[in-house]
Protein backbone atom coordinates (compact mmCIF):
# COMPACT_ATOMS: atom_id res chain seq x y z
CA UNK A 1 0.00 0.00 0.00
CA UNK A 2 1.46 3.34 -1.01
CA UNK A 3 0.27 4.86 2.28
CA UNK A 4 2.97 3.00 4.22
CA UNK A 5 5.55 2.90 1.44
CA UNK A 6 4.66 -0.74 0.89
CA UNK A 7 5.39 -1.50 -2.82
CA UNK A 8 5.24 -4.64 -4.88
CA UNK A 9 8.34 -6.80 -5.30
CA UNK A 10 10.89 -5.43 -7.73
CA UNK A 11 10.95 -6.82 -11.25
CA UNK A 12 13.87 -9.05 -12.20
CA UNK A 13 15.21 -6.39 -14.55
CA UNK A 14 15.75 -4.06 -11.59
CA UNK A 15 17.81 -6.51 -9.54
CA UNK A 16 21.15 -5.07 -10.55
CA UNK A 17 20.03 -1.52 -9.77
CA UNK A 18 18.74 -2.62 -6.37
CA UNK A 19 22.03 -4.28 -5.52
CA UNK A 20 23.91 -1.10 -6.43
CA UNK A 21 21.52 0.94 -4.29
CA UNK A 22 22.24 -1.33 -1.30
CA UNK A 23 25.94 -0.66 -1.77
CA UNK A 24 25.25 3.08 -1.87
CA UNK A 25 23.23 2.86 1.36
CA UNK A 26 26.02 1.00 3.09
CA UNK A 27 28.47 3.57 1.77
CA UNK A 28 26.50 6.27 3.58
CA UNK A 29 26.67 4.29 6.82
CA UNK A 30 30.23 3.00 7.03
CA UNK A 31 33.59 4.73 6.77
CA UNK A 32 36.18 3.83 4.12
CA UNK A 33 37.89 1.16 6.24
CA UNK A 34 34.64 -0.59 7.04
CA UNK A 35 33.53 -0.42 3.43
CA UNK A 36 36.82 -2.01 2.38
CA UNK A 37 36.29 -4.77 4.93
CA UNK A 38 32.72 -5.27 3.71
CA UNK A 39 33.85 -5.46 0.09
CA UNK A 40 36.58 -7.95 1.02
CA UNK A 41 34.09 -10.05 2.97
CA UNK A 42 31.63 -10.08 0.09
CA UNK A 43 34.39 -11.01 -2.37
CA UNK A 44 35.51 -13.90 -0.17
CA UNK A 45 31.94 -15.11 0.23
CA UNK A 46 31.39 -14.96 -3.54
CA UNK A 47 34.57 -16.96 -4.06
CA UNK A 48 33.36 -19.58 -1.59
CA UNK A 49 30.04 -19.81 -3.41
CA UNK A 50 31.64 -20.25 -6.83
CA UNK A 51 34.09 -22.86 -5.59
CA UNK A 52 31.45 -24.85 -3.72
CA UNK A 53 29.01 -24.74 -6.63
CA UNK A 54 31.70 -26.08 -8.94
CA UNK A 55 32.49 -28.91 -6.50
CA UNK A 56 28.92 -29.73 -5.52
CA UNK A 57 26.85 -29.31 -8.66
CA UNK A 58 25.19 -32.66 -8.03
CA UNK A 59 23.96 -31.66 -4.56
CA UNK A 60 20.41 -30.52 -3.87
CA UNK A 61 19.70 -26.92 -2.87
CA UNK A 62 19.49 -27.61 0.88
CA UNK A 63 22.69 -29.68 0.95
CA UNK A 64 24.53 -27.11 -1.13
CA UNK A 65 23.48 -24.23 1.12
CA UNK A 66 24.56 -26.18 4.19
CA UNK A 67 27.96 -26.92 2.63
CA UNK A 68 28.46 -23.29 1.64
CA UNK A 69 27.47 -21.54 4.83
CA UNK A 70 27.73 -24.07 7.65
CA UNK A 71 26.44 -22.60 10.92
CA UNK A 72 25.22 -19.47 9.13
CA UNK A 73 22.57 -21.63 7.48
CA UNK A 74 20.01 -20.81 10.16
CA UNK A 75 19.97 -17.07 9.51
CA UNK A 76 20.10 -17.51 5.74
CA UNK A 77 17.20 -19.96 5.91
CA UNK A 78 15.26 -17.34 7.87
CA UNK A 79 15.76 -14.87 5.04
CA UNK A 80 14.58 -17.42 2.50
CA UNK A 81 11.49 -18.22 4.59
CA UNK A 82 10.64 -14.51 4.76
CA UNK A 83 10.90 -14.21 0.98
CA UNK A 84 8.80 -17.35 0.55
CA UNK A 85 6.09 -15.91 2.80
CA UNK A 86 6.09 -12.68 0.76
CA UNK A 87 5.79 -14.68 -2.47
CA UNK A 88 2.88 -16.68 -1.01
CA UNK A 89 1.12 -13.46 -0.01
CA UNK A 90 1.55 -12.07 -3.54
CA UNK A 91 0.21 -15.30 -5.06
CA UNK A 92 -2.80 -15.20 -2.72
CA UNK A 93 -3.45 -11.58 -3.62
CA UNK A 94 -3.45 -12.47 -7.32
CA UNK A 95 -5.90 -15.33 -6.77
CA UNK A 96 -8.13 -13.58 -4.21
CA UNK A 97 -11.57 -12.18 -5.15
CA UNK A 98 -12.21 -8.49 -5.63
CA UNK A 99 -12.57 -6.42 -2.47
CA UNK A 100 -16.30 -5.90 -1.92
CA UNK A 101 -18.73 -5.33 0.95
CA UNK A 102 -19.23 -9.06 1.49
CA UNK A 103 -15.49 -9.62 1.91
CA UNK A 104 -15.34 -6.59 4.19
CA UNK A 105 -17.97 -8.11 6.49
CA UNK A 106 -16.13 -11.43 6.49
CA UNK A 107 -12.96 -9.67 7.59
CA UNK A 108 -14.79 -7.93 10.44
CA UNK A 109 -16.05 -11.29 11.68
CA UNK A 110 -12.59 -12.80 11.34
CA UNK A 111 -11.06 -9.92 13.30
CA UNK A 112 -13.64 -10.25 16.09
CA UNK A 113 -13.12 -14.02 16.33
CA UNK A 114 -9.33 -13.74 16.27
CA UNK A 115 -9.26 -11.03 18.93
CA UNK A 116 -11.55 -13.15 21.12
CA UNK A 117 -9.12 -16.08 20.82
CA UNK A 118 -6.23 -13.81 21.80
CA UNK A 119 -8.22 -12.55 24.80
CA UNK A 120 -8.72 -16.13 26.00
CA UNK A 121 -4.99 -16.93 26.09
CA UNK A 122 -3.38 -17.25 29.54
CA UNK A 123 -1.00 -14.44 30.49
CA UNK A 124 0.82 -13.57 33.73
CA UNK A 125 -0.44 -10.55 35.63
CA UNK A 126 1.40 -7.25 34.98
CA UNK A 127 4.23 -6.49 37.40
CA UNK A 128 5.71 -3.16 38.58
CA UNK A 129 8.80 -1.86 36.79
CA UNK A 130 11.08 0.55 38.63
CA UNK A 131 11.90 3.64 36.57
CA UNK A 132 15.56 2.62 36.22
CA UNK A 133 14.87 -1.11 35.85
CA UNK A 134 16.50 -3.13 33.07
CA UNK A 135 13.03 -4.55 32.50
CA UNK A 136 12.19 -1.49 30.40
CA UNK A 137 15.00 -2.22 27.93
CA UNK A 138 13.80 -5.80 27.53
CA UNK A 139 10.21 -4.62 27.21
CA UNK A 140 11.24 -2.24 24.40
CA UNK A 141 12.85 -5.07 22.44
CA UNK A 142 9.77 -7.25 22.89
CA UNK A 143 7.49 -4.55 21.50
CA UNK A 144 8.90 -5.58 18.10
CA UNK A 145 7.88 -9.17 18.83
CA UNK A 146 5.21 -9.74 16.21
CA UNK A 147 7.22 -8.60 13.19
CA UNK A 148 10.37 -10.18 14.65
CA UNK A 149 8.60 -13.53 15.01
CA UNK A 150 7.17 -13.40 11.48
CA UNK A 151 10.66 -12.69 10.10
CA UNK A 152 12.35 -15.16 12.47
CA UNK A 153 14.48 -12.36 13.94
CA UNK A 154 16.23 -12.71 17.28
CA UNK A 155 14.55 -11.18 20.33
CA UNK A 156 17.57 -11.66 22.58
CA UNK A 157 18.93 -8.13 22.18
CA UNK A 158 19.06 -5.10 19.91
CA UNK A 159 20.50 -6.95 16.88
CA UNK A 160 17.85 -8.67 14.79
CA UNK A 161 20.29 -11.01 13.04
CA UNK A 162 23.96 -11.93 12.90
CA UNK A 163 26.07 -9.23 11.24
CA UNK A 164 26.91 -10.95 7.97
CA UNK A 165 26.57 -9.19 4.59
CA UNK A 166 23.76 -11.38 3.29
CA UNK A 167 21.54 -10.58 6.28
CA UNK A 168 22.42 -6.89 6.35
CA UNK A 169 21.42 -6.63 2.69
CA UNK A 170 18.25 -8.62 3.34
CA UNK A 171 17.18 -6.31 6.18
CA UNK A 172 18.00 -3.21 4.10
CA UNK A 173 15.83 -4.66 1.32
CA UNK A 174 12.90 -5.30 3.68
CA UNK A 175 13.02 -1.76 5.07
CA UNK A 176 13.32 -0.20 1.62
CA UNK A 177 10.62 -2.27 -0.10
CA UNK A 178 8.10 -2.30 2.75
CA UNK A 179 8.59 1.24 4.02
CA UNK A 180 10.39 3.22 1.31
CA UNK A 181 13.17 3.98 3.81
CA UNK A 182 16.78 4.09 2.64
CA UNK A 183 18.64 5.92 5.40
CA UNK A 184 18.77 7.69 8.73
CA UNK A 185 16.64 10.74 7.95
CA UNK A 186 13.74 8.78 6.48
CA UNK A 187 13.93 6.27 9.33
CA UNK A 188 13.73 8.90 12.07
CA UNK A 189 10.92 10.72 10.26
CA UNK A 190 8.85 7.55 10.12
CA UNK A 191 9.50 6.66 13.77
CA UNK A 192 8.47 10.19 14.78
CA UNK A 193 5.29 9.90 12.71
CA UNK A 194 4.36 6.56 14.26
CA UNK A 195 5.07 7.71 17.81
CA UNK A 196 3.39 11.13 17.57
CA UNK A 197 0.58 10.69 15.03
CA UNK A 198 0.31 7.34 13.28
CA UNK A 199 -2.89 5.37 13.07
CA UNK A 200 -4.09 6.74 16.41
CA UNK A 201 -4.69 10.10 14.76
CA UNK A 202 -5.88 8.59 11.50
CA UNK A 203 -8.45 6.36 13.22
CA UNK A 204 -9.61 9.37 15.26
CA UNK A 205 -10.28 11.32 12.06
CA UNK A 206 -12.24 8.41 10.60
CA UNK A 207 -14.29 8.07 13.80
CA UNK A 208 -15.16 11.78 13.91
CA UNK A 209 -16.14 12.11 10.25
CA UNK A 210 -19.87 12.16 9.52
CA UNK A 211 -19.31 10.67 6.07
CA UNK A 212 -16.42 9.46 3.89
CA UNK A 213 -16.71 12.66 1.85
CA UNK A 214 -15.35 14.66 4.80
CA UNK A 215 -12.09 12.73 4.43
CA UNK A 216 -11.59 13.59 0.75
CA UNK A 217 -10.54 16.44 -1.48
CA UNK A 218 -13.07 17.57 -4.06
CA UNK A 219 -11.01 16.17 -6.93
CA UNK A 220 -10.51 12.71 -5.36
CA UNK A 221 -10.72 9.86 -7.87
CA UNK A 222 -12.88 6.76 -7.56
CA UNK A 223 -10.15 4.64 -6.01
CA UNK A 224 -9.54 7.24 -3.30
CA UNK A 225 -13.28 7.38 -2.59
CA UNK A 226 -13.51 3.61 -2.22
CA UNK A 227 -10.50 3.60 0.09
CA UNK A 228 -11.96 6.34 2.29
CA UNK A 229 -15.31 4.57 2.42
CA UNK A 230 -13.73 1.32 3.63
CA UNK A 231 -11.76 3.11 6.34
CA UNK A 232 -14.80 5.14 7.42
CA UNK A 233 -17.02 2.04 7.66
CA UNK A 234 -14.34 0.31 9.76
CA UNK A 235 -14.17 3.26 12.17
CA UNK A 236 -17.95 3.59 12.45
CA UNK A 237 -18.25 -0.10 13.25
CA UNK A 238 -15.69 -0.04 16.06
CA UNK A 239 -15.58 3.53 17.40
CA UNK A 240 -17.85 2.82 20.39
CA UNK A 241 -15.81 -0.27 21.29
CA UNK A 242 -12.25 0.95 20.74
CA UNK A 243 -10.96 4.48 21.38
CA UNK A 244 -8.16 5.90 19.20
CA UNK A 245 -5.56 5.09 21.87
CA UNK A 246 -6.23 1.41 21.24
CA UNK A 247 -4.21 1.81 18.03
CA UNK A 248 -1.05 2.32 20.11
CA UNK A 249 0.08 -1.29 19.74
CA UNK A 250 -0.04 -1.10 15.94
CA UNK A 251 1.93 2.16 15.88
CA UNK A 252 4.40 1.33 18.65
CA UNK A 253 5.06 -2.23 17.50
CA UNK A 254 6.06 -1.10 14.02
CA UNK A 255 8.11 1.81 15.35
CA UNK A 256 10.00 -0.56 17.66
CA UNK A 257 10.78 -2.86 14.75
CA UNK A 258 12.00 0.04 12.62
CA UNK A 259 14.20 1.17 15.51
CA UNK A 260 15.87 -2.23 15.76
CA UNK A 261 16.26 -2.50 11.99
CA UNK A 262 17.78 0.98 11.85
CA UNK A 263 20.26 0.13 14.59
CA UNK A 264 21.18 -3.14 12.89
CA UNK A 265 21.92 -1.27 9.66
CA UNK A 266 23.98 1.38 11.44
CA UNK A 267 21.61 4.23 10.62
CA UNK A 268 21.21 5.02 14.33
CA UNK A 269 23.50 4.17 17.25
CA UNK A 270 22.57 1.60 19.87
CA UNK A 271 22.28 4.41 22.41
CA UNK A 272 19.85 6.27 20.15
CA UNK A 273 17.87 3.08 19.59
CA UNK A 274 17.66 2.44 23.34
CA UNK A 275 16.34 5.97 23.88
CA UNK A 276 13.71 5.55 21.17
CA UNK A 277 12.59 2.21 22.60
CA UNK A 278 12.32 3.79 26.05
CA UNK A 279 9.92 6.43 24.71
CA UNK A 280 7.93 3.82 22.81
CA UNK A 281 7.76 1.68 25.94
CA UNK A 282 6.25 4.53 27.94
CA UNK A 283 3.62 5.13 25.27
CA UNK A 284 2.66 1.45 25.13
CA UNK A 285 2.43 1.19 28.93
CA UNK A 286 0.24 4.31 29.12
CA UNK A 287 -2.26 3.22 26.47
CA UNK A 288 -2.42 -0.57 26.87
CA UNK A 289 -2.55 -2.99 29.79
CA UNK A 290 -1.34 -6.42 28.68
CA UNK A 291 0.43 -8.31 25.92
CA UNK A 292 -2.94 -9.67 24.83
CA UNK A 293 -4.28 -6.14 24.39
CA UNK A 294 -1.09 -5.17 22.56
CA UNK A 295 -1.61 -8.11 20.17
CA UNK A 296 -5.27 -7.19 19.66
CA UNK A 297 -4.24 -3.63 18.88
CA UNK A 298 -1.79 -4.90 16.28
CA UNK A 299 -4.50 -7.01 14.64
CA UNK A 300 -6.91 -4.06 14.74
CA UNK A 301 -4.47 -1.67 13.09
CA UNK A 302 -3.32 -4.34 10.67
CA UNK A 303 -6.82 -4.82 9.31
CA UNK A 304 -7.37 -1.07 8.91
CA UNK A 305 -4.11 -0.89 6.97
CA UNK A 306 -5.20 -3.72 4.68
CA UNK A 307 -8.58 -2.04 4.16
CA UNK A 308 -6.79 1.14 3.13
CA UNK A 309 -4.65 -0.89 0.74
CA UNK A 310 -7.68 -2.71 -0.64
CA UNK A 311 -5.81 -5.99 -0.16
CA UNK A 312 -8.19 -8.94 -0.60
CA UNK A 313 -5.61 -11.25 1.03
CA UNK A 314 -6.07 -9.47 4.38
CA UNK A 315 -7.33 -12.68 6.02
CA UNK A 316 -3.98 -14.39 5.48
CA UNK A 317 -2.19 -11.37 6.94
CA UNK A 318 -4.33 -11.49 10.08
CA UNK A 319 -3.48 -15.17 10.36
CA UNK A 320 0.25 -14.45 10.31
CA UNK A 321 -0.16 -11.81 13.02
CA UNK A 322 -2.34 -14.01 15.22
CA UNK A 323 0.03 -16.98 14.98
CA UNK A 324 3.01 -14.81 15.90
CA UNK A 325 1.20 -13.27 18.87
CA UNK A 326 0.06 -16.67 20.13
CA UNK A 327 3.60 -18.03 19.96
CA UNK A 328 4.85 -15.04 21.93
CA UNK A 329 2.17 -15.31 24.61
CA UNK A 330 2.03 -19.06 25.21
CA UNK A 331 5.04 -20.52 23.37
CA UNK A 332 5.23 -23.35 20.86
CA UNK A 333 4.94 -27.10 21.31
CA UNK A 334 8.73 -27.42 20.97
CA UNK A 335 9.16 -25.13 24.01
CA UNK A 336 10.42 -22.20 21.90
CA UNK A 337 8.72 -18.81 21.89
CA UNK A 338 6.86 -17.51 24.93
CA UNK A 339 8.96 -14.34 25.13
CA UNK A 340 5.98 -12.21 26.18
CA UNK A 341 4.87 -14.81 28.73
CA UNK A 342 8.35 -14.76 30.28
CA UNK A 343 8.42 -10.94 30.59
CA UNK A 344 5.11 -9.70 32.03
CA UNK A 345 3.60 -6.40 30.99
CA UNK A 346 4.41 -3.39 33.24
CA UNK A 347 1.77 -2.70 35.88
CA UNK A 348 0.19 0.79 36.00
CA UNK A 349 2.65 3.24 37.49
CA UNK A 350 2.20 4.95 40.81
CA UNK A 351 2.07 8.74 40.99
CA UNK A 352 5.59 10.13 41.14
CA UNK A 353 7.13 7.47 38.88
Task: Give residue spans per PLM region.
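Cysteine-rich micro-motifs
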Residues: 1
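Polar/charged low-complexity regulatory segments
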Residues: 6-270, 279-353
Amino acid sequence: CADEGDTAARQAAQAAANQQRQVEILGQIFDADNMAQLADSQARMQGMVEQAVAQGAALGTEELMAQLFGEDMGVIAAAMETLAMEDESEDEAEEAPDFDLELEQQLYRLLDETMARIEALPEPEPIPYAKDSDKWARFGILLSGIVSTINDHSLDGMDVEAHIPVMEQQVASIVRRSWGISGRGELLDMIRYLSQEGYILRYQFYCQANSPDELLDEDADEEARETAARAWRFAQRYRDQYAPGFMAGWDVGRAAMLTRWGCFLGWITESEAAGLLWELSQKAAEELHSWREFAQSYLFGGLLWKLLCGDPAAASYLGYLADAATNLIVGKADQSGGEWRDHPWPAPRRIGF
